[in-house]
Amino acid sequence: MFHLINFQLPLIFSLLIVLVAAKILGEVAERFGQPSMIGEVVAGMILGPSLLNVIQNTAELKVLAELGVFLLIVMAGLEIEVEEIRNSIRGKNIWIALLGFIIPFIGGALTGYAFHFNNTFSIILGLCIAITALPVSIRILMDMGKLNTEVGQKIISAAIFNDIVSLLVLGVILDFNDESKRLSDIVYSSAFTIGKIVLFMFILIVAYRLFKLVKSKMRIVNPKVNDFLHYLRGKESLFALVIVFVLIFSSIAEAMGLHFIIGAFFGAILLPRTIFAKGDFKKVKESTSGITMGFLAPVFFATLGIAIDVTSLGNLPLLLMVLAVSFFTKIFGGYFGGRFAGLDRSTSFTIGLGLNARGIMELVIANIALQRGFIDVSVFSILVIMALLTTIFTPFFLQCGFNVIERNSPRPNIHSS
């Protein structure tokens, strides 16, 4: 077997092959109306031990993948504003957000227990199944021209809620004791972590209040901020300042024993948009997207594919059960949430179909669980395949749901005077 790792510059050659393969297959996926991450993960599977075995997950590639995780989470946070978080839990929308998360979470956890896995694994399985990928959902709905419809907005609101809750639950899971067998052990081992999360949320609330105070003084603050930004001569200085801002919150999270992505996500959300001059915030997002989607994200998704070992997928019953539970519990959660919110059956069912899009956040959490030793390669492989398959089929089923809504919607009477 030919191994590129034997070359004098293994990182450069490995990176070249990984990036080229990931971008080519990512482009192929885009041509078929799928997120590029699907092609990028498949590229890793082809290059890794599943097929060609020419690339290994070296320490250097893992460092680049970690940077990719950081910037992917920052990108997700930059797409969310505090007001959107309020909208996701405002009024009857809370039913869709809650049941769209809780029912799949319970279904996934019960699946883990049914297969005699420990508490930590079962809860991680439930968490990965419960997530709806915000960027993937936005992309699918935009391609369908349904982003600004009632169904589209409720799916996005639920996805925002899911992303936030999933990271908070992750913070608790990372301190679980694997040897715990009783519920009381889990509660006691998690109490300190929950306290840290509450403290971190308090810091976020204080920061948000300070930013609101600054916003109320915009006539005084804005000119000074703009003068400072114009004073900077270095290229992409504004982008660097944004990264520093987010890193501060990531560092706070790490110092408190939480994972850095929790701080990165909430730091990006709290970033005050109003202090930017017209067009500057868009430039920051474009800079972040360029380095992330053009370089680091493909490397991250490819490393996930490299980590998959298809030969380790010996537990076919678990794979089939995870696929079934992940698909149907999301439908049930969205359906019952929609019904409690006062929506009709077809609209509620379509929301449940739309909540099945998974991707970035679920893959990030699965990767963290693998690194921490909470799950093995076979389970990790099942979670990645589940994310890919549910995401691939979601656009087709969602379009069917929209077609049902259109057929059931009242048509104007063209003969009426």
Give, region by region, the residue ranges found by the protein language model.
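Structural signature of hydrophobic alpha-helical transmembrane segments
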Residues: 3-17, 58-75, 119-134, 193-202, ...
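Entry/N-cap segments of selected transmembrane alpha helices
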Residues: 7-23, 81-114, 119, 182-203, ...
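Core mid-bundle transmembrane helix pairs that form the ion/substrate translocation pathway
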Residues: 15-16, 164, 171-275, 279, ...
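C-terminal ends of transmembrane helices
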Residues: 19-32, 75-88, 137-146, 208-219, ...
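Flexible hinge motifs at transmembrane-helix junctions and intramembrane kinks/re-entrant loops
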Residues: 24-38, 114, 248-263
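Membrane-interface junctions of multi-pass transporters
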Residues: 47-92, 225-322
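The feature identifies polytopic integral membrane transport proteins across all domains of life
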Residues: 55, 59, 87-99, 117-129, ...
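Short helical (or helix-break) motifs at transmembrane helix termini and adjacent helical loops
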Residues: 76-80, 103-108, 129-170, 329-337, ...
